Amino acid sequence: MKRIFISLTALVLALCMCIGLCAGAYADGTAPVAENLELQTYQNVSVGGSLSAYDPDGGALEYTITTEPVKGSIKLENDGSFVYTPRENKKGRDYFGYKAADADGNLSQEATVIIKIEKPKKDVLYSDMRGRADEYSAVLLSEKNIFTGEQIGGEYCFGPDKNVSRGEFLSMCMLISGKPLLESAMKTGFADDENIPSWMKGYVSTAAMCGVAGGGEYGEAFEAQTPVTKSEAALMLDRAINVTTVSYIPLDEALDADIAQACANLSACGVMDDAIGRNGEYLTRGEMARMLSAAIKLTENR
C-alpha cells in the first residue's frame, strides 16, 4: 500500500508540474498567424500591399521576407506595407514568403504573397508613378477607360498630388457603377448648369436622377470645377456603387450621418480607410486611384 501511495503522489506531482508548465507557456503567448495574400499588376508596373498577421496577445509584430520573389523585387517597410516591382517585361505568376514575429521572438509559419503579372492592353506607363505603391491603381484606371493622365513630351504623367474636381470624380464613379447614362441630356437641373462642361452633363444628370449627385457647398449649384473633398468623394462613391449598409462599425458622430455611414460602408468592404472621410482636405489623384481601383475590383467580383 505504501508503494501505491508513493506512486500516486508522484503521479499527482507530475501532473501538477505539467499543468504549471502548460499554463506558463500559454501565459507567455503563442506564435502569430500570418495571412496569405494575392495581388495583380501589369508588366513593368509596381503594386503595393500590406502584410497581415494576427497576434493572440495583441502585441506589435515585425515582418521579415523569408523567400525572395523571382520575377521582381520587394521593398518592405517596418509597418508591413510593401511595394513589389516586377523585373523588366516579366509576366506570369510570382510569389514571395514572409514570417511575422512578436515581441517575444515567436515566429509564425511562412505565409505566401502571390502576384499575377499581366500584359496590359494599352501602352500607358506613368513617368511620375514608377516604383510607387499606387502605380498599378493608376494604370488600372486607364486600362478600364476610366481615367488617363496627361501626355507631355511623349511621356504619360499621372499627377498623383493634383486635386480632383467634383465633376471629374462623379463622372468616374458613374462609369464604374455601370448605370446607363442620359447621353442626350442638355440640362442637369442645377443652378450652375451653364458652368458644367457639355461632356459631363450626361454623368451629372444620371447621377442626380439616381440620387448619387448633390449640390456643392451651397446646395443648389453642383460646382463641377470645385475640388472634391475626401468626405464628398466617399459619399458619391458609396451611392454610385450601392455598397451594403453596415451597422457593426461605429459611426463618427463628428460627421454628417450620411457621410459617416458612407465611410463605414466603404471601409467594411476595403474600398477606403474610414479615416479618410473624416479629413476635410481635397482628394488627390493618387488617393482617387486607390479608391476607384478597389471599387472596380469590388464591382467586378459581385
Describe the residue ranges of each PLM region.
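Positively charged n-region of N-terminal signal peptides that target proteins for export
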Residues: 1-12
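Feature responds to low-complexity, polar/acidic, surface-exposed segments characteristic
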Residues: 16-19, 23-28, 37-42, 114-135, ...
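Extracellular interdomain linkers/hinges and stalk-like, low-complexity segments
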Residues: 26-57, 63, 96-121
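Short glycine/proline-centered coil/turn motifs in the loop regions
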Residues: 56-59, 68-70
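Low-complexity "stalk/linker" and mucin-like segments enriched in Ser/Thr/Pro/Ala/Gly
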Residues: 66-79, 150
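Short strand-edge motifs at loop-to-beta-strand transitions and within beta-strands
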Residues: 80-84
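Surface-exposed, short loops/turns at beta-strand junctions within beta-sandwich domains
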Residues: 88-92
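Alpha-helix C-terminal capping/helix-coil junction sites
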Residues: 142-143, 204, 208-209, 267
